[in-house]
């Protein structure tokens, strides 16, 4: 797998997202702008300027009409994908660490930081998909995280629940209409934060990554842990591959803890695990520093990773990836 190296950011990557068609990649970094790229050749489609601080998060609606971003300047911004125009800015008391559209992009959730006496919150905003129409200032729902702040969050199937990962390693399930807390489960080791939460294609289950060096596959309905992937390094990101039963994990020693310059020493590789058998099946090297974010093409043709080194690496899966099977899987096919 020869990667395409995308060099559009001057500082560490924070998040990568593919659009639903898998042909455009959006990336954010700590350098105040969002980049859009063509996935097949790495050509830059454009940049979105306006934020006044590190951008932590981005998401794109299913029709690739609008994108939303959250940043350290305490704002959520809505952008027109085609023109790069900022359609709306919502102000908050603290930094916004995660944004995600629901399945039909009529609502957007935003996770805010706990800081300066303000508690961490999950806020839901109503979205108008017409780029020429007005956007509402009102918050449709505010969930306050009094126990432990939320670090990541997302919408389950049919936008039924809001699932949040917390700083204390727990995962919560909220009713998306009322904001009522339905479940809270200690999925990861106490006080080691959940660093990422990404969905299966049908949003009935999700994968979490954590500083406790594990990733977990969790059922969205009852927060039951179905699979555990054990690694030897703190994880920053985890993603589920469609088509094949794999998960991709990314992490590495924290940048400030790195004392050696060898990429091998810091464990800066994307790791592939078998989703069902929980075994590591391969690694992809390349980043010079921890992997901060991994994202998989929704069509299952490839994946992208973003690192502390400021690069996005886009990989197209080759034939060997699609042909790979466990002996058990081969036996089942032959029957």
Swiss-Prot record:
SUPFAM superfamilies for this protein: WD40 repeat-like
GO MF, one example: RNA binding
UniProt cross-references to PROSITE patterns, sorted A to Z: WD_REPEATS_1, WD_REPEATS_2, WD_REPEATS_REGION
Ranges occupied by WD repeats: 8-47, 50-91, 145-184, 189-228, 286-325
UniProt superkingdom: Eukaryota
Family per record: Belongs to the eIF-3 subunit I family.
Subcellular location: Cytoplasm
Name of the protein: Eukaryotic translation initiation factor 3 subunit I
Keywords tagged on the record: Cytoplasm, Initiation factor, Protein biosynthesis, Repeat, WD repeat
HAMAP family linked to this entry: eIF3i
Species this chain originates from: Sclerotinia sclerotiorum (strain ATCC 18683 / 1980 / Ss-1) (White mold)
Pfam family, one: EIF3I
A cellular component term, taken from the record's GO annotations: eukaryotic 48S preinitiation complex
Reported function: Component of the eukaryotic translation initiation factor 3 (eIF-3) complex, which is involved in protein synthesis of a specialized repertoire of mRNAs and, together with other initiation factors, stimulates binding of mRNA and methionyl-tRNAi to the 40S ribosome. The eIF-3 complex specifically targets and initiates translation of a subset of mRNAs involved in cell proliferation.
Oligomeric form and interacting partners: Component of the eukaryotic translation initiation factor 3 (eIF-3) complex.
Record keyword Glycosyltransferase present: no
PANTHER family: EUKARYOTIC TRANSLATION INITIATION FACTOR 3 SUBUNIT I
Main location: cytoplasm
GO biological process, any: cytoplasmic translational initiation
């Amino acid at each position: 797998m020869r990667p395409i190296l995308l060099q559009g950011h001057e500082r560490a990557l924070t998040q990568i997202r593919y659009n639903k068609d898998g042909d455009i990649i959006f990336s954010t970094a700590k350098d105040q702008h969002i980049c859009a790229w063509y996935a097949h050749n790495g050509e830059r489609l454009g940049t979105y300027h306006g934020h006044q601080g590190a951008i932590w998060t981005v998401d794109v609606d299913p029709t690739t009409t609008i994108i939303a971003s959250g940043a350290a300047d305490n704002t959520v911004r809505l952008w027109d994908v085609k023109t790069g125009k900022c359609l709306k800015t919502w102000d908050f008391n603290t930094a916004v660490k995660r944004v995600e559209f629901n399945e039909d992009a009529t609502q957007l959730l935003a996770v805010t930081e706990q800081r300066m006496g303000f508690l961490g919150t999950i806020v839901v905003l109503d979205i108008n998909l017409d780029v020429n129409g007005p956007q509402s200032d009102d918050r449709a729902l505010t969930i306050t995280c009094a126990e432990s702040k939320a670090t990541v969050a997302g919408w389950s199937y049919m936008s039924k629940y809001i699932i949040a990962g917390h700083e204390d390693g727990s995962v919560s399930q909220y009713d998306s209409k009322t904001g009522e807390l339905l479940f809270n489960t200690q999925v990861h080791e106490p006080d080691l934060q959940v660093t990422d939460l990404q969905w299966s294609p049908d949003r009935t289950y999700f994968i979490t990554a954590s500083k406790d060096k594990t990733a977990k596959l969790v059922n969205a309905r009852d927060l039951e842990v179905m699979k555990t992937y054990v690694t030897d390094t703190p994880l920053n990101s985890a993603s589920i591959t469609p088509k094949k039963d794999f998960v991709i994990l990314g992490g590495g020693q924290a940048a400030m803890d790195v004392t050696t310059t060898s990429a091998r020493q810091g464990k800066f590789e994307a790791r592939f695990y078998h989703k069902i058998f929980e075994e590591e099946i391969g690694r992809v090297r390349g980043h010079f520093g921890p992997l901060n974010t991994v994202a998989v093409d929704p069509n299952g043709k490839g994946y992208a990773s973003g690192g502390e080194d400021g690069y996005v690496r886009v990989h197209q899966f080759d034939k060997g990836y699609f042909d790979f099977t466990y002996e058990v899987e081969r036996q089942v096919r032959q029957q």
